[in-house]
């Protein structure tokens, strides 16, 4: 014996009551009602289950965001800060894949120098045109400031590091490199020699 279930469905302009019997399904009554009337509709159990499943499919079609899996939030990559015995702190921004620099090597690099508060001091890369004038340094404490040498040793060509260099291993005299050739930038750099300086270094080549 077929089972019938009664549900309430809204219709616009009219309502219909459908009944299911043992041998036939027929429309038993049609009546005109108001615009927002609700009628009881007798629906066979099998039809009800089919309609229910169809409705869930429509829900997913109408709202695809409900069907799509929720993407997992990625944790931001944490850049570690390493501290050397001299007090130099640095971060590995990009790990290079080229030749590794050792003490005594001649290297070519670009750099940006800033004060610890972020104010610009000097750079080998033009801020407007993007053109660069790389410098060549010998990784020796008699040629380059000690703190920068410590940061460069162990770097690989193509790598980039950001370092905070304390004045004790910075420009302890005016002959140490890197130092701008122009008078204005050189004076600006040396005027901040007694404070920590931030260097962002890109190692281009190990010669």
UniProtKB/Swiss-Prot annotation:
Reactions this protein catalyses: [protein]-peptidylproline (omega=180) = [protein]-peptidylproline (omega=0)
GO biological process: regulation of protein stability; response to high light intensity; response to water deprivation
A GO MF label: peptidyl-prolyl cis-trans isomerase activity
InterPro entries recorded: PPIase_dom_sf (IPR046357), PPIase_FKBP_dom (IPR001179)
Sequence ranges assigned to domain PPIase FKBP-type in this UniProt record: 104-207
Subcellular location: Plastid, Chloroplast thylakoid lumen
Entry GO CC: chloroplast; chloroplast thylakoid lumen; thylakoid lumen
Chloroplast found in the keyword field: yes
Keyword Zinc-finger on entry: no
EC number: 5.2.1.8
Principal subcellular localisation of the protein: plastid
Matches recorded under Pfam families: FKBP_C
Entry keywords, A to Z: Chloroplast, Isomerase, Plastid, Rotamase, Thylakoid, Transit peptide
Family in the record: Belongs to the FKBP-type PPIase family.
Function: PPIases accelerate the folding of proteins. It catalyzes the cis-trans isomerization of proline imidic peptide bonds in oligopeptides.
PANTHER family listed in its UniProt record: FKBP-TYPE PEPTIDYL-PROLYL CIS-TRANS ISOMERASE FKPA, PEPTIDYL-PROLYL CIS-TRANS ISOMERASE FKBP16-1, CHLOROPLASTIC
The name this protein goes by in its record: Peptidyl-prolyl cis-trans isomerase FKBP16-1, chloroplastic
Annotated source species: Arabidopsis thaliana (Mouse-ear cress)
């Amino acid at each position: 014996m077929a089972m019938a279930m009664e549900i309430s469905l809204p219709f616009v302009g009219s309502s219909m009551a459908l009944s299911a019997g043992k041998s036939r399904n027929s429309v038993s009554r049609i009546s005109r009602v108001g615009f927002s009337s609700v009628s009881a509709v007798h629906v066979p159990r099998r039809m009800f289950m089919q309609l229910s499943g169809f409705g869930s499919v429509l829900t997913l079609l109408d709202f695809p965001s409900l069907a799509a899996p929720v993407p997992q939030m990625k944790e931001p990559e944490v850049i570690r800060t390493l501290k050397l015995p001299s007090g130099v702190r640095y971060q590995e921004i990009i790990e290079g894949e080229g030749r590794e620099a050792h003490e005594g090597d001649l290297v070519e690099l670009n750099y940006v120098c800033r004060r610890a508060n972020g104010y610009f001091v000097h750079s080998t890369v033009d801020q407007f045109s993007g053109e660069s004038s790389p410098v060549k340094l010998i990784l020796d404490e008699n040629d380059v400031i000690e703190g920068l040498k410590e940061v460069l040793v162990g770097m690989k060509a193509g790598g980039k590091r950001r370092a905070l260099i304390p004045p004790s291993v910075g420009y302890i005299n005016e002959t140490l490199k890197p130092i701008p050739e122009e008078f204005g930038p050189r004076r600006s750099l040396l005027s901040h020699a007694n404070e920590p300086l931030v260097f962002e270094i890109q190692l281009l080549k190990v010669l």
